[in-house]
């Protein structure tokens, strides 16, 4: 029985919160069940639909794993490596954690072939690894992983908002609600919270303008 691993991330670009890299393993036969459930790229689904889809995906999957990389970890790692290399390490961790004959990744590098090669090297897994741009639209196993990762990311933002009692927006630098939250937090506390990526230019600019 051929086992195929799909891997995708959610939260690479936000200034607020963790990044999540999800891996899900399916047999070739399971792909028919995924298709019957209507699995597609997470960006094409509403948050409610993603959550209901998550339960179906996990009930079909042979194995799954979600790696969380916190804002603090990203800041620390960026002092010694590029964001591309962080993506390689995170995807490698997921690939090495799960058992499959083949892995398909959504490429997190402009050079998809180089990304696959680096993940293969770092993971140390002797399996076939394919990385493609927009793999979540081309391969249903990657679409499934994108849903799992996105739900984990959405859930973490909701949990943060509940703990703080205030809206964070999407967490992306382009979101006015996110920028407003950061400005208000700096005004009130004089610094940025631990769940913000302080190495992001948006965070640095807002912090500098408050001095």
From Swiss-Prot:
Domain of life: Archaea
Pfam family, one: RNase_HII
InterPro entries documented for this protein: RNase_H2_suA (IPR004649), RNase_HII/HIII (IPR001352), RNase_HII/HIII_dom (IPR024567), RNase_HII_arc (IPR020787), RNase_HII_hlx-loop-hlx_cap_dom (IPR023160), RNaseH-like_sf (IPR012337), RNaseH_sf (IPR036397)
Record bears the keyword Cytoplasm: yes
Reactions performed catalytically: Endonucleolytic cleavage to 5'-phosphomonoester
Binding annotation for a divalent metal cation: 8-9, 106
Cellular localisation: Cytoplasm
Keyword Magnesium: no
Essential cofactor(s): Mn(2+); Mg(2+)
CDD domains linked: RNase_HII_archaea_like (cd07180)
Location of the RNase H type-2 domain: 2-211
GO biological process: DNA replication, removal of RNA primer; mismatch repair
A single GO molecular function term of this UniProt record: manganese ion binding
Chief location of this protein within or outside the cell: cytoplasm
Free-text function comment from the UniProt entry: Endonuclease that specifically degrades the RNA of RNA-DNA hybrids.
Protein name, UniProt field: Ribonuclease HII
Organism: Methanothrix thermoacetophila (strain DSM 6194 / JCM 14653 / NBRC 101360 / PT)
Source taxonomy: Archaea, Methanobacteriati, Methanobacteriota, Stenosarchaea group, Methanomicrobia
Gene name for this UniProt entry: rnhB
